[in-house]
A protein has these predicted regions:
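Short loop/turn microsegments at loop-to-beta-strand junctions
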Residues: 3-5, 48, 53-54, 100, ...
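Conserved ATP-binding/catalytic segment of the ANL
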Residues: 4, 11-19, 23-77, 106, ...
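A sequence-level detector of short linear motifs
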Residues: 17, 67, 84, 194-195
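AMP-binding/adenylate-forming catalytic core of the ANL superfamily
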Residues: 28, 33-34, 56-168, 179, ...
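Solvent-exposed, non-membrane alpha-helical residues enriched in polar/charged side chains
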Residues: 33, 43, 47-48, 89, ...
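Conserved C-terminal "lid"/linker of ANL adenylate-forming enzymes
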Residues: 101-105, 110, 153-226
Length: 226
């Protein structure tokens, strides 16, 4: 990693030894000096010449750096354990033609939830294949049950059981009414999901997912999203 300096810091700013995870901080001539006309962001990001990347990772040795996730996206269980959700999120999308986007959320909550954008055209085709009117309530129930099945393939008994730790799989699913695009600002210019905006916009959906009614994927909010 020469000529760049790298260190791994824990939440208290203590440098970590090889093999221990923490925030990746970098320093060197090729590291930015700060944000243009934004001293606050610069001060928050660069401390004593070290750029705090917001990435979680660890050094295997002096030459090998592993990046394992973003701190802002980390799932945090009620007991404080942390987990990077990107692998689950990517697989939910890649393994299903019915899911266009997915992010997971757990901020010391009772369980993890998923916020997904469905492929409505594929779901409507599925409903038509069952001989149902896609606009009917019966069809929408079938669509939601199908989305739940797409999540359940990673659970015990599913064909991809064991791919991810069971405790981090979503116990509830929020089906969102619109896709994520640059135009509605749910995607940034790099086509990455702006998690904060999604979570702020659909705060009511998320709160509902932590109720007995909302934990069942067949609920009023999800039906209204289809």
């Amino acid at each position: 990693v020469s000529p760049m300096e790298i260190k791994i810091l824990d939440a208290d700013g203590v440098e970590q030894p090889f093999g221990s995870k923490g925030e990746i901080c970098i320093k060197g001539e090729n590291v930015m000096a700060g944000y243009w006309k934004n001293p606050k962001s610069t001060a928050d990001t660069i401390v004593d010449g070290w750029l705090h990347t917001g990435d979680m990772g660890y050094m295997r040795d002096e030459e090998m750096l592993y990046v394992v996730g973003r701190f802002k996206s980390l799932l945090i269980a009620a007991d404080g354990e942390k987990y990077s959700p990107e692998g689950i999120e990517e697989n939910l999308v890649e393994s299903s033609k019915y899911i266009d986007g997915a992010i997971l959320h757990n901020s010391q909550d009772p369980y993890t939830i998923a916020l997904i954008t469905p492929n409505k055209d594929a779901l409507k085709a599925y409903a038509k294949g069952l001989g149902l009117d896609p606009a009917s309530n019966e069809a929408k129930v079938k669509m939601l049950e199908l989305l739940q099945d797409e999540v359940n393939i990673y659970r015990k008994g599913g064909r991809l059981e064991g791919a991810f730790p069971e405790r981090w799989l979503p116990a509830a699913v929020c089906v969102l009414p619109e896709p994520w695009t640059e135009q509605n600002h749910f995607l940034n210019s790099s086509m990455k999901v702006v998690r904060g905006r999604v979570e702020e916009t659909y705060k009511a959906h998320m709160e509902y997912a932590y109720t007995p009614e909302g934990k069942n994927i067949v609920n009023d909010m999800n039906l209204a999203s289809l």
